[in-house]
């Protein structure tokens, strides 16, 4: 619970500047990659975005779908509600979701998976709330030989700006989260024992980020 509270507190405190931060570290490509992730769940009539933050993914999703986002940060959800008034937002834990079994056609996570405290428990919950053959799409940072360069970029090249925007401790939190990234193979090894079949892996920005599409089996 302490880890989750720290995560919620950090994201609550940066909610006003979070979109600026994401544009900064992704060289303004964040929306392109989120749209690529959303293509993997195209046709979903019910969509759940886990760790929805400021609601950017749901804002870009099919407006005809029932769009729901959950997050641990109330401050983030307040921003999201202003952005996407036709979406539903719930203050909830991804490892204990307040939804009935087989509620959603698809689940998305944008730069969230590596922050989860108990990923096995989340995947069990995702299995439960997804309909049979439902889709899970994960966009996140890849752990491979270029990742240290991204850490260096954040630790030194843009650190002064990061500290101005978020403060030293919170900036260190984001750097540490990058160091905890999973490789695509590590992610695959977590998904498959928990009832998901990996369908597709796409890489962007020389492999620094990936979009992994999986199906509930």
Feature map (PLM): residue ranges:
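A short SAM/SAH-binding and catalytic strip from SAM-dependent methyltransferases
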Residues: 106-118
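Class I SAM-dependent methyltransferase SAM/SAH-binding core
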Residues: 48-96
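Core SAM-dependent methyltransferase catalytic element
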Residues: 194-217
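Short glycine-centered segments of the SAM/dcSAM-binding site in methyltransferase folds
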Residues: 46, 133-135
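C-terminal alpha-helical "lid/dimerization" subdomain adjacent to the S-adenosyl-L-methionine
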Residues: 5, 22, 57, 139-190
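Conserved class I S-adenosyl-L-methionine
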Residues: 1-42, 56-57, 79, 170-175
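A short glycine-rich, Lys/Arg-flanked "PGG" loop and its adjoining helix->strand segment in the class I
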Residues: 120-132
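A short acidic, Gly/Pro-enriched loop at the edge of an enzyme's catalytic core
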Residues: 95-106
């Amino acid at each position: 619970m302490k880890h989750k509270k720290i995560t919620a507190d950090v994201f609550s405190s940066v909610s006003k500047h979070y979109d600026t931060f994401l544009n900064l570290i992704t060289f303004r490509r964040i929306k392109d990659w989120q749209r690529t992730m959303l293509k993997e769940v195209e046709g979903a009539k019910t969509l759940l975005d886990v760790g929805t933050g400021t609601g950017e993914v749901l804002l870009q999703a099919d407006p005809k779908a029932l769009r729901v986002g959950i997050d641990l940060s109330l401050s983030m959800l307040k921003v999201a509600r202003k952005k996407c008034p036709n979406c539903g937002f719930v203050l909830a834990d991804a490892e204990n979701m307040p939804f009935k079994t087989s509620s959603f056609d698809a689940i998305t996570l944008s730069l969230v998976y590596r922050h989860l405290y108990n990923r096995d428990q989340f995947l069990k919950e995702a299995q439960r709330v997804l309909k049979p053959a439902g889709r899970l799409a994960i966009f996140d940072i890849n752990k491979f030989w270029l990742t240290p360069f991204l850490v260096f970029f954040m630790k030194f090249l843009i650190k002064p700006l990061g500290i101005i925007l978020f403060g030293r401790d919170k900036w260190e939190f984001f750097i540490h989260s990058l160091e905890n990234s999973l490789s695509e193979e590590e992610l695959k090894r977590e998904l498959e024992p928990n009832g998901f079949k990996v369908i597709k892996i796409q890489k962007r920005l020389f492999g620094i980020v990936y979009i992994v599409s999986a199906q509930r089996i």
